[in-house]
Amino acid sequence: YQEALGATLIERTFRERIVLVGVTLGGHTDEDTEEGLDELSLLVDTAGADEAARITQRRDTPDNAFYIGKGKVEELKEVCLAIDADTVVFDNELTPGQQYNLERVLGRTALDRTAVILDIFAQNAHTQEGKAQVELAMLRYRLPRLRRGAKAGLSQQGGGIGTRGPGETRLETDRRRIM
């Protein structure tokens, strides 16, 4: 549990500056999006961070790569740089691929509402059962978000003399630890 709590998603040594992102999809109103962002702002505050800015976009459907459009991603990047934001938090559920793509382009952590809620639970779990349940939920959330490391330092692909092949990659090791 301590390892999971230590790896909570929002840094607490200082109050992070967060940019909130909301997308108004077809069938919803701008007011719905603003209400969702107001609630998300309270969640972020509870998690120990400060809302620094908000960005919204209207879309018929989410972008497969980023959830928001490429132009809005560039605008988000500029806002993050201008206000020195640490993290962006989406009110909408991000796929692991969207989260990865956003983090790669923005150069900072991208989270969704679920991650913030899990972070709050991790901070406030006190009983053994509660801690175990939070850890399990966090591991289930993180499992599909594991990525193969691009750096050679993350690979453990050396098979030794007399072994039957290459060793585990970091991704395989992480996946095995979670499962």
Features from the language model and the residues they span:
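N-terminal accessory targeting/assembly segments
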Residues: Y1-R113, I117
